[in-house]
Amino acid sequence: MAIPNRSTYVIVGAGIHGLSTAYHLALELKSRGIGSGKDIIVLDKTGVCAGASGIACGVIRNNYYQSSMRELMAHSVKVWESDPQAYSYHPVGYMQVSCERMHSDVATIYQQQQAIGYQSTFVEGKADCERYMKGIFGDWQAQGITSVLHEMPGGYSNNTRAMLALAAKAEGEGVQIFSGVEVTGFSRDNAGSISAIETSRGVIESDYVVIAAGPWAGKFWDMLEMPATISIKSPTDGSIANDVPMWVYWSLQEGTLGVDPNMQVSNDGT
């Protein structure tokens, strides 16, 4: 398939963020009557879910400490629930089983969940936690547990299947996905705005560019000549930390374990 030399929207990265942006943008353009998925292309230097989205754990949860994310995560869980078969989504819920050191933080998460009507159960105290866990796993043996946060929505997804389904949904709306296309640079107009994307297969003019490159975001940050360091204001005392590196990468290795499917079955057989 020939790559167009112009597209209103260009999305860089065919992982969860890039494909989700493409699909939902296509739906929004159509619903407003101002365009369609045909106005969108997605570029990836390898292919759909070739990066982090293809090896991530696939857990779907609303268990984050930042309160600003709470409603966004609740919304996202509903998206997974909207088509569980296509997204290979298993709504088994999510549990955070914690020691005392994490008790207060987890309690805060629970309070934030209740404030937006997100269904969850919070159990406190060693005896009650042990009783609750043994009600699910009769052979539960973990010690030192003082809190259990049990989210009823959520679960996990087989991520590669989910990404392929999401790509198909986007393409069904007219989005074009191009694999094996590496972005090498950007062109700017006289006002300094990005006007075109330079790729290994030619230049593409565009009105809007979305960078959804996951772990490669730092590379594009450098391409755009953005600052290597930033200043951050402390939320507690207002002090300013200067020259903080914009990007710090940690090494995380994930994989798949082959286990007996009957291992760790709950009391009700699930």
Q: Which residue ranges define each predicted feature?
A:
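Conserved Rossmann-like nucleotide-cofactor binding loop
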Residues: 17, 48, 216
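A short, basic/flexible loop-to-alpha-helix module at the beginning of a structural domain
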Residues: 1-6
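N-terminal Rossmann-like FAD-binding beta1-loop-alpha1 element of flavoenzymes
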Residues: 7-41
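Flavin (FAD/FMN) cofactor-binding and adjacent substrate-gating region
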Residues: 81-82, 101-179, 184-193, 198
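Short, well-ordered alpha-helices that flank and scaffold nucleotide-derived cofactor binding pockets
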Residues: 23, 27-31, 164, 168, ...
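Flavin-dependent oxidoreductases
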Residues: 20, 61, 186-193, 198-270
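Conserved FAD-binding subdomain of flavin-dependent enzymes
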Residues: 24-28, 39, 45-120
